[in-house]
Amino acid sequence: MSRILLGVNIDHIATLRQARGTSYPDPVHAAAVAEHAGADGITIHLREDRRHIIDRDVYLLAKTLKTRMNFECAVTEEMLNIACEVKPTYVCLVPEKRQEVTTEGGLDVAGQLDKITAAVSRLAANGIQVSLFIDADKTQIDAAVASGAPLIEIHTGCYADAKTADEEAKELERIREMAKYAHGKGLIVNAGHGLHYHNVKPIAAIPELYELNIGHAIVARAAIDGLATAVKDMKTLMLEGRRGE
């Protein structure tokens, strides 16, 4: 049985920081905690609007990570320049719309093959392995192969957002089929988006999947699981302060 890896996305640690414009919680610290807990890699998305991860995070993480950085970005000159300077292990090219809350779908590789191929070639020339975030679709998988990218990440959002058991089963089967198809084409196949503690097992059971990238669910679970300790620690400090300790 092949091992499956976990890439922990720490974007929403940064979201919490940016909500108040503070210096904490620090995603760099969060990455170290995640690595210590068993994360096989750290995923970050530097968006053009810098809504959560900021440039400072990227450069510090490049120096401090003990595992691997998976750097998600749009296919823009600015982002490609940053990627080529930082040289993460992986760059995952994703679609990006300013008004979206989170990435809403896969990259249309087939519709912009020349642009994607040029980006893949440029990143590869800098020693970076390129992944393309795409829907579970044969046309997009074939285009990914044509672009020269060695990896894809299958968008699992439709599976995660399924409203009925039948819809979920249909999406799961589609992901299974496309993971097998892509693997047969020689691609390394990852998956992610919307995965959480109640839907991850069927995805993790797909033998062709190499790594799952999961973030929001882990950060949300951490906020609840760590809340009791955080409240107790704050109450202790307040009581010590009142006693003059």
UniProtKB/Swiss-Prot annotation:
Q: Which GO cellular component term is one of those annotated? A: cytosol
Query: Where is this protein localized, as stated in its record?
Result: Cytoplasm
Q: Which residues bind 3-amino-2-oxopropyl phosphate?
A: 9, 20, 194, 215-216
Its main localization is cytoplasm
Chain coiled-coil ranges: none
Active-site residue numbers: 45, 72, 193
What keywords would UniProt list here? Cytoplasm, Pyridoxine biosynthesis, Transferase
What Enzyme Commission number does this protein have? Answer: 2.6.99.2
Superkingdom of the source species: Bacteria
Positions with a binding annotation for 1-deoxy-D-xylulose 5-phosphate = 11-12, 47, 52, 102
InterPro entries in UniProt: Aldolase_TIM, PyrdxlP_synth_PdxJ, Pyridoxine-5'_phos_synth
Single GO molecular-function term?
pyridoxine 5'-phosphate synthase activity
What is catalyzed by this enzyme?
3-amino-2-oxopropyl phosphate + 1-deoxy-D-xylulose 5-phosphate = pyridoxine 5'-phosphate + phosphate + 2 H2O + H(+)
Q: Where is this site: Transition state stabilizer?
A: 153
Subunit info here reads:
Homooctamer; tetramer of dimers.
Similarity annotation: Belongs to the PNP synthase family.
Please give the function described in this protein's UniProt entry: Catalyzes the complicated ring closure reaction between the two acyclic compounds 1-deoxy-D-xylulose-5-phosphate (DXP) and 3-amino-2-oxopropyl phosphate (1-amino-acetone-3-phosphate or AAP) to form pyridoxine 5'-phosphate (PNP) and inorganic phosphate.
Show the NCBIfam families listed in the entry. pdxJ, PRK05265.1-1, PRK05265.1-2, PRK05265.1-3, PRK05265.1-5
The protein here is known as Pyridoxine 5'-phosphate synthase
Q: Which organism is it from?
A: Shewanella oneidensis (strain ATCC 700550 / JCM 31522 / CIP 106686 / LMG 19005 / NCIMB 14063 / MR-1)
Give the lineage.
Bacteria, Pseudomonadati, Pseudomonadota, Gammaproteobacteria, Alteromonadales
